Structures are given as structure tokens and as C-alpha cells.
Amino acid sequence: MNIKIGSLLLLLIVSDISFAADDGIAYLQQEIKVKVEVLDEPCDIAPGDELINIDYGTIVDKYLYINTRTIGEKFKINLIDCDISISDRVAISFSGIENSKLPGMLSVIPMSGQGDVGIGIGFETESGEFIPLSDEKQYKLNEGDNSFTFNTFVQAEIDRLIARTIKLGEFESSAIFHLNYD
């Protein structure tokens, strides 16, 4: 799973519109003032955490037919050099292409190009609370280094479980994690 992050940017656009008359003809004059302020991010992402790969290894289809989903695979987002005078909270969310049959979960792409596999990938907190795509989880930051643990899991689509038609083979998916500081 490829996970990336973007930068924080605040853009303020102020537009002043005025009319001026010259020789009896009205002209529209528009002055646009742009102020761009790049904010200091309170934390840096630990080197190597910009791209997180998760390998599920071999998943036996019979396991999914019995349990509907796999046990969560842990991964961490490590933030370093946090300055809580800038912000003491972070909201973490995940985005990607959603599986239409498993709301809030990522769709997967079969490596063989066989079409729909019948599974999705979900995110959850370390304690097992489901995190739908685009939903933010709020966390308090500590001065210095912070580590946030999450799980991803593979879940079968209900109709594929009933029909026992999960396609076998390798698959991939990607998501982006977002950090929003308060």
C-alpha cells in the first residue's frame, strides 16, 4: 500500500472590484491581492514513513469464507520533532478509491487483470475501531516524537461470501494518509 502526504498551505484571496469612468465610458477594474502564507508544520514525518508498504502475505480464501476478514496488519505513522506551541493536535485520515460494495473501504486491483476480486481493505485503530475512508481520527500531540499505530485488514464482500466467488490471485491497492493540524 503506497501512502503519501502533502503539505499544508493557506491561501487567502481578496478581490476588490471598482468601476472608473473615463470619457463617459465605464470600465471594470479588478485588483486581486494574493497573500500566501506557508505555515510551519508542527511535526516532521519520520524518514521512511512517507511511503509505507504492507504485505499481507498469503491469505487463504477458506479463512475469509469462515471469518469474513483477516486479522489486522499493524503499521505506524511516526511524527518527529513535534513543536506543540504550533499545534497540539493532529487529525489523521486515509483516502483512496472506495470499494462500492464495502463502504468506507479501499478497492483492490488484481495483479492479473481479472476484474473484481471480491475483497476490500479497511483501516482501524490499534484497538480495532473501524476508520472509514475520509473520516478523521483526532490525536493529541506530545512535544518531540509521536507514534500512531493503525491496522489494515482484508475483508470479503458479502455477496462473494454467500456465492463463494472470491477470486484468487495477487492484488494491490493504494491510499494516502492526511495529517491535519489544529
Predicted feature residues:
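Sec-dependent signal peptide recognition
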Residues: 2-10
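Mature extracellular/passenger domains of Gram-negative fimbrial/pilin and adhesin proteins
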Residues: 2-3, 19-182
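Hydrophobic h-region of N-terminal signal peptides that target proteins for export
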Residues: 11-19
